Amino acid sequence: MFISLWEFFYGHFFRFWMKWLLRQMTGKCELQRIFDTYVGAQRTHRIENSLTYSKNKVLQKVTRVVQSEVDKYVDDIMKEKNINPEKDASFKICMKMCLLQITGYKQLYLDVESVRKRPYDSDNLQHEELLMKLWNLLMPTKKLNARISKQWAEIGFQGDDPKTDFRGMGILGLINLVYFSENYTSEAHQILSRSNHPKLGYSYAIVGINLTEMAYSLLKSEALKFHLYNFVPGIPTMEHFHQFYCYLVYEFDKFWFEEEPESIMYFNLYREKFHEKIKGLLLDCNVALTLKV
Amino acid sequence: MGLLSILRKLKSAPDQEVRILLLGLDNAGKTTLLKQLASEDISHITPTQGFNIKSVQSQGFKLNVWDIGGQRKIRPYWKNYFENTDILELAELLEEEKLSCVPVLIFANKQDLLTAAPASEIAEGLNLHTIRDRVWQIQSCSALTGEGVQDGMNWVCKNVNAKKK
């Protein structure tokens, strides 16, 4: 009750006068003050909040623009806030980078979502080739006898046709699996062989698909903002999403063997524990999660 | 009736808990069925490692639904979940001692697909007519659209009631 009352007064009254006072004292607007004080994700995050909660219609709109219009909107902000490009030369550059990060994050989610929504299609040659590529990367010395085969279980699919295992993650699940196997081949081989452990083993491919879901839902809930704002000085792309997925796969395997679960039946319990751990790391505004091998 | 006796009556009739095991082949739609029952989003489902559990309220019962992964590799673990099961949903397990007399409901899922076999054909294929030692029911449904799922659960509640009395 008291807190919400305070928030109401702060939002509607104090915030305005605080900003006015600071502006008179420093001769700078809130955006400029943020650039002076903060760096990295904290800077981008504060700029994003300042723009979103601004009462100025032009400023409110900029967090929702598309990447190609960023330059135009930076000029609009400078006009609106009376910022002299000669007196504050860095403003334009800093503002542009922040806007590219903010709009880029939103675009990345839309891109990832559109790939996820595409189901695996056996009639699509590209999909089939990608699936065969996964087999060859993971099993370089063993030939797959047939497209429909019990052998798929050796890399952790459930049945004799991997097609049915992609489900809610669509082709995104397969692209992630291939990306990890291609860019971290020796780690992938190591994790695959560990996943065949008689007691602590798990199904490599379907756990991979499950971790695609984790990466996807973290992106969707905006939990990846600090990480991506720190990690990518500009527009985050699919590549960065895949990189984060690789981090999850590598770290999950380590986590699983450290925890020594009684059996695979406890998977969801440990998955949730791991999920909480990652969410905790992502709350730190200096976070940048990279796979270190 | 005095207030006290009303209170006593309320206290003596707590929600009965029912344990339901959902078993079936991989990619049968068990998790989708579970999420449909709990009115959750079904668009992000991935294959189940281990199990999922959800509790739903239905007709005065608390249904604890266990959705166990269908992958061949983990089927040996199924028997760990057989203790105290009230309703069972697959035919292969009828000979399991721990599950004797447990009513069985077979969901003929994916009826939204044109290629789905009708419930009558499945009943014949599974020789359901030869089951004599328990009540059984086959229910066609689509976990995707939710059609038939509630009908199945109504049958569950009715038969648990009969069994427990």
Curated annotation (Swiss-Prot), chain B:
One of its GO terms (cellular component) is midbody. Transmembrane segments: none annotated. A lipid is attached at residue 2 (N-myristoyl glycine). GTP binds at residues 24-31, 67-71, 109-112. The keyword Repressor does not apply. Pfam families: Arf (PF00025). The keyword Cell cycle applies. This is ADP-ribosylation factor-like protein 3. Coiled coil: none annotated. GO terms for molecular function: GDP binding; GTP binding; GTPase activity; microtubule binding. It comes from Pongo abelii.
